[in-house]
C-alpha cells in the first residue's frame, strides 16, 4: 500500500478480519520489519531508527489489554515510571477513567489483580489508554482498543484527544 499520514493527523484503518490492519500498525513499532518497500516515520526509514528510540515515540493500545498486579497508579506508571500523581490523574481524565477510579474506595491506590480481572473490559481499556498517554507518544495507535466502551465514552475519549493532544498522530 502507499499511505501518507501527516504529523498530528488522525486516521482510521478499516477492513475485514485478516486484512492486515493490525499487521500494518505493528510495523510502525518495528514488532517486525517490512519485507518489501519501506516504511518511513518522520521522513526516515524505520529500519534506521534505534528500536528503543522508535518505540519510545510510539504507544500502542490493543483490543486485548494487559493490567498487572498492583495499584492503579502503578499500572498507569508503566507508561512513565517517573510520572507524578497529577500526571497520572490527567491522563486518566483524558481516557475517561478518572470517573470510575474516583468511585473506588481507595481511588488510585485501588489494587488491580493480575490481568485486571477485578475491573470491567471497558475500564481495563481506559486504564491502558491512560498508560499509553502517560508516555507522551508522538504516535498513538489504538487497535480496536475502545471496543468494550459505550459510544458516549468513546466519543468523549476522541473529543479529549482532539482538544488536549492535537499534535499526536
Give the role of each language-model region:
Residues 1-169:
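ABC-type nucleotide-binding domain
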Amino acid at each position: 500500500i502507499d499511505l501518507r499520514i501527516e504529523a498530528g493527523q488522525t486516521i482510521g484503518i478499516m477492513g475485514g478480519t485478516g486484512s492486515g490492519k493490525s499487521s500494518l500498525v505493528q510495523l510502525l513499532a518495528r514488532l517486525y520489519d517490512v519485507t518489501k518497500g519501506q516504511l518511513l516515520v518522520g521522513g526516515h526509514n524505520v529500519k534506521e531508527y534505534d528500536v528503543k528510540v522508535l518505540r519510545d515515540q510510539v504507544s500502542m493500545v490493543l483490543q486485548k489489554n494487559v493490567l498487572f498486579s498492583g495499584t492503579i497508579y502503578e499500572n498507569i506508571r508503566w507508561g512513565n515510571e517517573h510520572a507524578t500523581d497529577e500526571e497520572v490523574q490527567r491522563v486518566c481524565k483524558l481516557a475517561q477513567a478518572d470517573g470510575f477510579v474516583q468511585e473506588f474506595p481507595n481511588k488510585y491506590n485501588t489494587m488491580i489483580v493480575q490481568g485486571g480481572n477485578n475491573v470491567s473490559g471497558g475500564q481495563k481499556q481506559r486504564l491502558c489508554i491512560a498508560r499509553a498517554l502517560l508516555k507522551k507518544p508522538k504516535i498513538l495507535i489504538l487497535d480496536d482498543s475502545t471496543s468494550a466502551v459505550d459510544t458516549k465514552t468513546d466519543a468523549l475519549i476522541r473529543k479529549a484527544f482532539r482538544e488536549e493532544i492535537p499534535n499526536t498522530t
